[in-house]
């Protein structure tokens, strides 16, 4: 109030506000805001139907999803973390008319790419979403997928992994199946930190340790399919190659004494 009126006249700040909003002083109301009085313009904005606003709401919501790397596909300018094949949008048993990523919404979605009995799944109502997808080998709820993963990991005994790795693995699968693999015990001669880093960061595996807290030659992986033997063999083969590389670089480092590396510090700027 005091910054808006001076000696009974509108200040430059208030005049600027009126001009910017195409208002006159007579259109303002004097209101009490806590311990002070303020001038305000009171107006009624005409309401709109929610269905007429949903297109914009969804577009804005999608843009706010934190995605580090986006990609384009097809001939349109839409961007997302992966190509979008279909858009399903239901409110109750009604389809919400939308067009996102160049796709018009409908009541159809897809189950698991390899395990589902049919390629296309129709939903009668939105309430059926989680239940129907489960019958087509997709656990739609993130928290439930993670519970399945943790239960599977715990069934094999002690394992190493933080919440960040659990979250990442949970986001990578639709139908989680926990399996156990192993590598040659000779690789245990590598520093445990090297083994754990290779398994967790590069392969998204969960290393295992024994009752004494020592790292073992076994590890746990979370697969998106149920073909156990082939999945385990493939993952063991990939890990073997990575551990061979790690062994080579570690042995190469051991060939140079620490004191011989001291002269290299002259090239380091602190």
Where are the model-predicted features located?
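Long, basic N-terminal domains or extensions that often function
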Residues: 1-187, 195
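Catalytic nucleotidyl-transfer cores of nucleotide-processing enzymes
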Residues: 161-269
């Amino acid at each position: 109030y005091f910054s808006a009126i001076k000696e009974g006249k509108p200040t430059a700040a208030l005049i600027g506000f009126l001009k910017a909003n195409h208002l006159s002083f007579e259109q303002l109301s004097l209101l009490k805001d806590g311990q002070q009085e303020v001038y305000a313009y009171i107006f009624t904005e005409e309401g709109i139907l929610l269905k007429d606003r949903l297109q914009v709401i969804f577009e804005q919501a999608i843009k706010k999803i934190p995605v580090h790397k986006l990609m384009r596909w097809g001939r349109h300018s839409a961007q997302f973390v992966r190509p979008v094949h279909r858009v399903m949008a239901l409110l109750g048993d009604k389809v919400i008319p939308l067009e996102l990523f160049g796709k018009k919404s409908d009541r159809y979605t897809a189950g698991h790419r390899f395990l589902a009995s049919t390629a296309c799944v129709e939903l009668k109502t939105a309430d059926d979403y989680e239940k129907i997808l489960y019958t087509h080998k997709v656990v739609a709820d993130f928290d439930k997928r993670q519970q399945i993963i943790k239960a599977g990991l715990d069934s094999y005994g002690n394992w190493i992994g933080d919440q960040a790795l659990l979250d990442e693995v949970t986001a990578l699968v639709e139908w989680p199946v926990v399996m156990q693999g192993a590598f040659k015990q000779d690789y245990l001669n590598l520093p445990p930190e090297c083994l754990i880093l290779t398994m967790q960061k590069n392969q998204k595996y969960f290393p295992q340790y024994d009752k004494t807290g020592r790292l073992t030659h076994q590890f746990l992986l979370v697969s998106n399919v149920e073909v156990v033997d082939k999945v385990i063999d493939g993952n063991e083969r990939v890990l073997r190659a990575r551990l061979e590389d790690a062994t080579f670089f570690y042995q190469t480092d051991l060939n140079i004494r620490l004191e011989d590396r001291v002269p290299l510090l002259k090239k380091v700027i602190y």
